[in-house]
Amino acid sequence: MSLNFLEFEQPIAELEAKIEALRDVSRRDESASVDLDKEIEQLEKKSLELTKKIFSNLGAWQVAQLARHPERPYVFDYIEHIFTEFDALAGDRAFADDKALVGGIARLDGRPVMVIGHQKGRGTKEKVFRNFGMPKPEGYRKALRLMKMAERFKMPIITFIDTAGAYPGVGAEERGQSEAIATNLKAMAGLTVPVICNVVGEGGSGGALAIGVGDYVNMLQYSTYSVISPEGCASILWRDSNKAPQAAEAMGLTAGRLKELELIDSIIEEPLGGAHRDLEAISASLKATLVANLAELEALDTDELLERRYQRLMSYGYC
């Protein structure tokens, strides 16, 4: 098993390395395999117990690291495992096609839906191509175009949020980054079709919110949602980005804390070790949640749907 272990997972990594070394010896020397099998089994049990212990007590900074894990599933992974007949749609019909934000029509258990999400990319070449998952205004305008298309054809909208934030470059600002985000917030609040938003990695500031207004907001267990990154917060408050762990704890960016504050609707449990450990399992859990959400929302008429969404949005910040 090839895994990219994070710093806090190093004790697990050391055990897994020992297990792999013993397996190599066992494969090379069949006469020793019987003796080694028992030792390998004991180490595997120890590794499992250690993983459970570490992941039962994660801090906010460790969750933030998991949300950014280089092997974490991205929107295209979920599209492949949850939906069928995906047909990508491109361009904002005004300036360009932003590769950081993707979308298209697909089927969820046979039901046509519009799927929209951030795509960070894997490997240097694709990360640059996808702008590290940070959309420009044309990306958000593309998303809005697809949402309006979905509304016209009465298709539910499902979004996957995973971005460090909207791209802050000069060109993006010149083309109206803040206006594009604000327009999406307003438009999504009034869409006459069900909208289900899912934070599957990083939920970074306005870049996440621009496709994050909906009837349901779900978060994966080890995803984050915040107005700024922990490093950015630490740089502002303490003038020291090394204080990011303290900032993460103070920001309340984890799914558990946001559920307590009633800012999200549900937490989708991840496989032990994180979503990247078992794509099939997390996809099945996410699909079950989407199907349940959609069944409930489609039972409402348009007026009930809009009133429910309005009340949900108005409850934010209420004490």
Swiss-Prot record:
Q: What is its main location?
A: cytoplasm
User: What is the recorded function of this protein according to its Swiss-Prot or TrEMBL entry?
Assistant: Component of the acetyl coenzyme A carboxylase (ACC) complex. First, biotin carboxylase catalyzes the carboxylation of biotin on its carrier protein (BCCP) and then the CO(2) group is transferred by the carboxyltransferase to acetyl-CoA to form malonyl-CoA.
KW Cytoplasm (keyword) present? yes
What are its E.C. numbers? 2.1.3.15
The chemistry this enzyme catalyses reads: N(6)-carboxybiotinyl-L-lysyl-[protein] + acetyl-CoA = N(6)-biotinyl-L-lysyl-[protein] + malonyl-CoA
Q: Does the keyword Lipid metabolism apply?
A: yes
- Compartments, record wording: Cytoplasm
Give the family from UniProt. Belongs to the AccA family.
GO BP annotations, alphabetical order: fatty acid biosynthetic process; malonyl-CoA biosynthetic process
Q: Which biological pathway?
A: Lipid metabolism; malonyl-CoA biosynthesis; malonyl-CoA from acetyl-CoA: step 1/1
The record, for Gene3D superfamilies, names: 2-enoyl-CoA Hydratase, Chain A, domain 1
Question: What does the UniProt keyword field contain?
Answer: ATP-binding, Cytoplasm, Fatty acid biosynthesis, Fatty acid metabolism, Lipid biosynthesis, Lipid metabolism, Nucleotide-binding, Transferase
- Which parts of the sequence belong to the CoA carboxyltransferase C-terminal domain? 35-296
Annotated NCBIfam families:
accA, AccA_sub, PRK05724.1
Which GO molecular function annotations are given, in alphabetical order? acetyl-CoA carboxylase activity; ATP binding; carboxyl- or carbamoyltransferase activity
HAMAP family in alphabetical order: AcetylCoA_CT_alpha
Q: Where are the annotated coiled coils located?
A: none
Q: State the organism of origin.
A: Photobacterium profundum (strain SS9)
Name of the featured protein: Acetyl-coenzyme A carboxylase carboxyl transferase subunit alpha
Q: Name one GO cellular component term.
A: acetyl-CoA carboxylase complex
| Binding partners and assembly | Acetyl-CoA carboxylase is a heterohexamer composed of biotin carboxyl carrier protein (AccB), biotin carboxylase (AccC) and two subunits each of ACCase subunit alpha (AccA) and ACCase subunit beta (AccD).
